[in-house]
């Protein structure tokens, strides 16, 4: 192999060395830019994306998988936070209501009612065959035994958002359309699998948008509900058997009013203003005061007068 000839050596501090180094750097930078442009074209043709910071190609499938894993982690965190919210609401047993995830979601279906006044069964990842809703809550009030009751089957579909500044992004629009289809199909399947009965079951689909980092509820959208005549207890048992995890909470009994509640009611109830009763006008010529001498006093006075007269008449002579 022939030996490569070397050029003349020069001092690194000389002007020639500085110019040569600048030329080499410029040529290298131009070559780098050309390579980057060519790599971008090749990656775009193959369905890949160029990462600006790392200057390395990133596969779109890898990004989608990473975002999917982040959504799964957020779902699991939301499930734990929702169960903790129900536990707190039932442990507090406060009749003035409570705040949190449980109260926010139940308010969409049942209105502003205390969470602890309902019999609640919450189920996660319910496998309905065609669909797999994230969460289903069966709510009913404690009514008279043997009488038809009204239950609420709340279907919750969770959508996690990485950025919570704007709700009009393309990804959120796609999530809304996807969630609407999922809720519609889930409600139809539940209506089909419900066992006919005498109870009234309100099927309420709800779409919830949650921020991934702060777990803050960004938006809750309720869609048209359906009312079916079914056996609410059998429907609850069937959905609980199809879920990956289920938890039941019994309605709290009516407790005696504590001193704190009485103080709360006393402070909340406005005090009535006493009515001013006008005093009657004084008569122009007041009557003279009447004597208050009773019958016994009059008899004693008459007896004393008679005894005095008798003593004077029978007075012995001197």
From Swiss-Prot:
GO biological process: symbiont-mediated arrest of host cell cycle during G2/M transition
GO cellular component terms listed in the entry, alphabetical order: host cell Golgi apparatus; host cell nucleus
Region (Disordered): 258-293
Keywords: Host cytoplasm, Host G2/M cell cycle arrest by virus, Host Golgi apparatus, Host nucleus, Host-virus interaction, Modulation of host cell cycle by virus
Disulfide bonds: none
Annotated transmembrane regions: none
Family the entry assigns: Belongs to the HHV-1 UL24 protein family.
Protein name: Protein UL24
Source organism: Psittacid herpesvirus 1 (isolate Amazon parrot/-/97-0001/1997) (PsHV-1)
Designated gene of the protein: UL24
């Amino acid at each position: 192999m022939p030996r490569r000839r070397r050029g003349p050596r020069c001092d690194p501090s000389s002007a020639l060395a500085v110019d040569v180094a600048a030329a080499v750097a410029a040529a290298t930078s131009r070559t780098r830019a050309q390579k980057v442009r060519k790599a971008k074209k090749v990656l775009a043709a193959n369905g890949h994306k160029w990462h600006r910071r790392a200057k390395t190609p990133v596969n779109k499938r890898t990004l989608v998988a990473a975002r999917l894993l982040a959504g799964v982690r957020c779902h699991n965190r939301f499930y734990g936070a929702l169960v903790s919210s129900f536990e707190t609401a039932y442990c507090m047993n406060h009749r003035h209501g409570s705040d949190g995830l449980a109260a926010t979601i139940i308010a969409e279906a049942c209105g502003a009612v205390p969470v602890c006044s309902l019999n609640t069964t919450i189920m996660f990842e319910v496998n309905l065959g065609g669909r797999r809703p994230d969460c289903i809550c069966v709510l009913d009030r404690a009514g008279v035994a043997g009488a038809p009751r009204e239950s609420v089957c709340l279907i919750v579909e969770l959508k996690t958002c990485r950025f919570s500044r704007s709700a009009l992004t393309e990804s959120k629009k796609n999530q809304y359309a996807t969630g609407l289809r999922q809720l519609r199909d889930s409600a139809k399947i539940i209506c089909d699998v419900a066992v006919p009965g005498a109870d009234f079951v309100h099927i309420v689909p709800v779409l919830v948008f949650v921020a991934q980092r702060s777990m803050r509820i960004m938006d809750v959208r309720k869609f048209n509900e359906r009312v079916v005549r079914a056996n609410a207890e059998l429907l609850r048992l069937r959905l609980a058997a199809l879920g990956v995890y289920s938890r039941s909470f019994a309605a709290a009994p009516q407790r005696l009013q504590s001193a704190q509640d009485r103080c709360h009611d006393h402070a909340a109830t406005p005090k009535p203003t006493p009515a001013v009763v006008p005093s009657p006008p004084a008569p122009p010529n007041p009557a003279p005061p009447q004597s208050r001498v009773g019958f016994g006093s009059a008899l004693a006075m008459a007896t004393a007068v008679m005894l005095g007269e008798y003593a004077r008449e029978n007075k012995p002579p001197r």
